Amino acid sequence: MLTRRSLRDSVLGVLMLAGAIGAGVGLAVALLHEAVVWTQSFVFSVAHGQDLGEAALADPWRTLLAPAIGGLLLGVMVKLVRRWRSNDIVDPVEANALYGGKMSLIDSLRLTLATLLSNGSGASVGMEAAYTQAGAGIASTLGQKLHLRRADLRTLVGCGAAAAISAAYGAPLAGAFYAFELVMGGYTIATLAPIGAASVAAVAVAHWLSDPSPALFFGRPAAVEGWDYVACGVLGFLAGWLSILAMQAVTVAERGFRALPIPVWARPALGGLALGALALAVPQVLGAGPGADPSQLARGLEAMAILLVAKIVASALSLGSGFRGGLFSASLLLGGLFGGLAYGVVELLVPGLGLDRMLLVLAGMGAVAAGIIGAPVTMVLLVLEATQDFWAASGVLIGVVVSTTVVRQAFGYSFATWRFHLRGVPIRGAYDVGWVSELTAMRLMRGDVKTILTTQTLDTLRRLHPLGAAKTVFAVEPDGSYAGIIDMGAVHDPSLGDEDAKTPVGELAKHADDFLRPGDDVRSVLQRFCSAEVEALPVVTSPTDRRIVGYVTEAYALRRYSQELERQRGEELGERSLYGRD
């Protein structure tokens, strides 16, 4: 039987649990995919698997109104659920960064249902957000039921997300590195085996339940030569700016909808109506998008340019108005279109250069997706698994590296971290920084506080606290509020005469404005010590009610901070040392 101790002490136990999670998530992804297809078939009256663009041409009224009705249902549902659960939904990245992998299964199902409704009604959003939220939520809930430690719970969240992407695209390598890059915050030896096991198990189950053909499939490019690599680099540079444009478009749309004098629950309906009107002109904008579908890339330059712009606008309208979902699949379509468009422009300007069209399509797909999603290795591996062509992957790697460099230097965020920034969440990735906020002054402080009233004399202070009895004594006002720190070395200074014995100790108190609050994290505590240049600081109830509840020494705060850093490093390496995996 799997218990907490067996999981802590057995690599095989963790692998078995990860494999079981992967299989369960693979089943969930297959069911969600069928639910989306069924919903779209019902809403748009299309045959199973038929493209939504074809339905738009057959029934314009349904195309115009279906996204609006879906948006209205979504808005009402969110409003009603908010009365029951008003908290924000924590996604896998935020959970691993701030909460040690703790996620709510109910909240994850909320997001999954909202994304299913959004995608099913034609909103230009992807289902990958629902897949990863459901997978990570299932894994986190199971880990919490087993009372796993923080590092193991974070790993299980990564397993759930990796399994979701692996099952969705039939790409276990891409799914695993999606977890490493976005959900875990990095690759470590300790997490390689469980995340790899979950990815493979998810793909196996998904292939067993559904069509085993890959979600993305391309013919192999021709031989890759020197000019092709140069073209991939230039394309990556331009793709980086396109990625920034797509992310900023969502922000502009969101601000625009917020400025409208309509209730929040009505915004998705209005956004859906605008999306439906756009779909009457460009039907391919409905739904997540077909990825970099070769059928869309076989169109003329003008048609590809129109679809590229329309897809950016459609995604911005959908996400900005309140539909739930992500830009994973949309970014693949945008990148593929951009690569095909770039090839056509080069052929017009420099005919006979001999560039490979499909290579530029793949490089554009990887570069734009990496810029928006923030997972460069994932996109390279996704292309590699889709094409099974190492030369193509090398060209894509160049475009991806240049694109992510442009986005990082010019913008500084991926789409996920940009959304965190707009919400005021202080994280740039899934690196575990939650322990910093959990190690507070309340946890660091000691309760044996030595205080004295400011009205008492120096002689009284000497009698109450003889030389060597205490390093620091805190002065307090008659009402108990903090008034400053008294240096006991100065109090027992031999140079002080008898006339100084009657001096009120309040005159010796310093640093009256230097104190800690119970909720201050260890980083804030150390910064306060650095600025105050004292050995100990009091912890007060609040800046207004300055009653002392404890004190923290700089030496102890530094020691605890170092221990936690060592513990984090040990967990990354899978060590079982004093401060590693316990």
Predicted regions and their residues:
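Intrinsically disordered or compositionally simple regulatory linkers and C-terminal tails
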Residues: 1, 423, 570-582
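Alpha-helical transmembrane segments and immediately membrane-proximal extracytoplasmic
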Residues: 1-438, 442, 447-464, 470-473, ...
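Short hydrophobic beta-strand motif reused across regulatory alpha/beta modules
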Residues: 177, 381, 483-491, 549-557
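A short, acidic, flexible beta-alpha connecting loop/helix-capping segment that sits on the rim
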Residues: 385-387, 543, 555
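Bateman (tandem CBS) regulatory domains
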Residues: 426, 437-450, 456, 487-490, ...
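The conserved cystathionine-beta-synthase
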Residues: 452-469, 476-477, 493-498, 502, ...
